[in-house]
């Protein structure tokens, strides 16, 4: 009798643990991210390719107010990491940035966001989802007309 009660209690405990773990996983996937959280969390993933250029490196180029660039590429990461990034990009919620462009073509989601302060672009963030996700952040004190010149030059 004691053995039956013990086994029953053990089964109840296992079922509750399983339900809790599943709920925690669902909650994490549905979590809203800010830009900073997105970069901080996913920059630590295994096999991520990181490139950071700071002020010293930027001084060698005519960068039109750009003081730094960060690029994180996840094409070598595991599929579950890519899926988590794609979900995070989809659920992004950061009111301190304005959306410049948002596209979703054939499962590839791209968002271009800007943070503007006192008539200057302080940050440009490019988020790309899909099979080869990437996060790009460009920091500086950029005049909007300089961005327009670069776009026109590259057309």
Predicted regions and their residues:
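Mature, folded catalytic cores of secreted/periplasmic enzymes
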Residues: 19-29, 86-91, 127
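Surface-exposed, polar helix/loop patches in the mature regions of secreted/periplasmic/lumenal proteins
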Residues: 87-146
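Bacterial Sec-dependent N-terminal signal peptides
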Residues: 1-27
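Short, low-complexity, Pro/Ser/Thr/Gly-rich segments in the mature regions of secreted, periplasmic
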Residues: 143-155
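Early exported N-terminus immediately downstream of N-terminal targeting peptides
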Residues: 25-85
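Localized chelating/binding microdomains
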Residues: 64-67, 121-122, 148-151
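Flexible, processing/modification-adjacent segments and terminal tails
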Residues: 20, 37-40, 146-149
């Amino acid at each position: 009798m004691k053995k039956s009660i013990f086994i029953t209690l053990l089964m109840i405990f296992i079922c509750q643990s399983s339900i809790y773990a599943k709920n925690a996983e669902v909650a994490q996937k549905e979590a809203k991210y800010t830009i900073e959280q997105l970069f901080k969390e996913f920059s630590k993933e295994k096999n991520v390719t990181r490139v950071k250029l700071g002020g010293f490196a930027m001084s060698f180029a005519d960068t039109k107010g750009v003081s730094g660039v960060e690029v994180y590429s996840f094409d070598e990461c595991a599929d579950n990491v890519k899926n988590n990034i794609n979900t995070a990009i989809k659920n992004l919620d950061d009111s301190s940035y304005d959306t410049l462009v948002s596209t979703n073509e054939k499962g590839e989601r791209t968002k271009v966001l800007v943070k503007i302060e006192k008539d200057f672009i302080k940050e440009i963030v490019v988020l790309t989802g899909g099979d080869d996700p990437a996060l790009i952040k460009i920091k500086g004190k950029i005049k909007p007309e300089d961005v327009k010149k670069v776009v026109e030059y590259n057309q």
